[in-house]
């Protein structure tokens, strides 16, 4: 099964979404990377 990338997911603020994260992580509201 392929890992689903959540970078750019709606719960992340646009400025965080624009930055993105590596390794399939997503930006939280503090612009910190976390695993979904």
From Swiss-Prot:
Domain notes: Has the CSalpha/beta fold, which comprises one or two short alpha helices connected to anti-parallel beta-sheets stabilized by three or four disulfide bonds.
Localization terms from the record: Secreted
The organism of origin for this protein: Vaejovis mexicanus smithi (Mexican scorpion)
Site feature location: Basic residue of the functional dyad: 25
Signal sequence coordinates: none
Lineage: Eukaryota, Metazoa, Ecdysozoa, Arthropoda, Chelicerata
Miscellaneous notes: Negative results: does not block hKv1.4/KCNA4, hKv1.5/KCNA5, rKv2.1/KCNB1, hBK, hERG, Nav1.5/SCN5A channels when assayed at a concentration of 10 nM.
S-S bridge residues: 6-26, 12-31, 16-33, 21-36
Sequence similarity: Belongs to the short scorpion toxin superfamily. Potassium channel inhibitor family. Alpha-KTx 23 subfamily.
GO-annotated molecular function: ion channel inhibitor activity; potassium channel regulator activity; toxin activity
Keyword line: Amidation, Disulfide bond, Ion channel impairing toxin, Neurotoxin, Potassium channel impairing toxin, Secreted, Toxin
Protein name in UniProt: Potassium channel toxin alpha-KTx 23.1
SUPFAM superfamilies named in the record: Scorpion toxin-like
Chief subcellular location: secreted
Origin superkingdom: Eukaryota
UniProt xrefs under InterPro entries: Scorpion_toxin-like_sf, Scorpion_toxinS_K_inh
One GO CC annotation: extracellular region
């Amino acid at each position: 099964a392929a890992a689903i990338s959540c970078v750019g997911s709606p719960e992340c603020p646009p400025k965080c979404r624009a930055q993105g994260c590596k390794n399939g992580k997503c930006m939280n509201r503090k612009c910190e990377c976390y695993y979904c």
